[in-house]
Amino acid sequence: MAAKIKKGDTVIMIAGKDKGTKGEVLKVIPDESRVVVRGVNMVKRHQKPSQTDPGGLKSFEAPVHVSNVAIADPRDGKAVRVGFKIDQHGRKTRFAKRSGESIDV
């Protein structure tokens, strides 16, 4: 199955504690159906000091399930479903189903 969400996409959280938050996809984990989104699902972990790092509390983004995110429509920024179509060059591209706008540039 083709990937509907890719690294670099702007997505909106549609469920969870960060619902309504927009962010950029930093990493896609297809085996677990999860994505890492910038500034979303922040967690803190204790880091032991090392020779290069002083340690302490570190914050980073934890993965969220793909069902909790939706691609932002390129036209108005609202959550939208994704469809696929073949363009004039024979490439499979993604488009926003509500506006018909192409997601792939």
Swiss-Prot record:
Instruction: Give the GO biological process terms.
Output: translation
- Give the top-rank taxon of the lineage listed in the UniProt record for this protein: Bacteria
**Gene3D superfamilies reported in the protein's UniProt record:** 2.30.30.30
Carries keyword Methyltransferase? no
Entry GO terms, CC: ribonucleoprotein complex; ribosome
Give the stretches traversing the membrane: none
| Statement: the UniProt record of this protein carries the keyword Ribonucleoprotein | yes
Q: Which InterPro entries match?
A: KOW (IPR005824), Rib_uL2_dom2 (IPR014722), Ribosomal_uL24 (IPR003256), Ribosomal_uL24_KOW (IPR041988), Translation_prot_SH3-like_sf (IPR008991)
Classification via SMART domains: KOW
Task: Offer an example of a GO molecular function term for this protein.
Answer: structural constituent of ribosome
Q: Which UniProt keywords apply?
A: Ribonucleoprotein, Ribosomal protein, RNA-binding, rRNA-binding
Tell me, how does this one assemble?
Answer: Part of the 50S ribosomal subunit.
Q: What is known about what this protein does? A: One of two assembly initiator proteins, it binds directly to the 5'-end of the 23S rRNA, where it nucleates assembly of the 50S subunit.
- NCBIfam families, per database record: rplX_bact (TIGR01079)
Per the record, the similarity remark reads:
Belongs to the universal ribosomal protein uL24 family.
- Name recorded for this polypeptide: Large ribosomal subunit protein uL24
- The gene that this protein is the product of is rplX
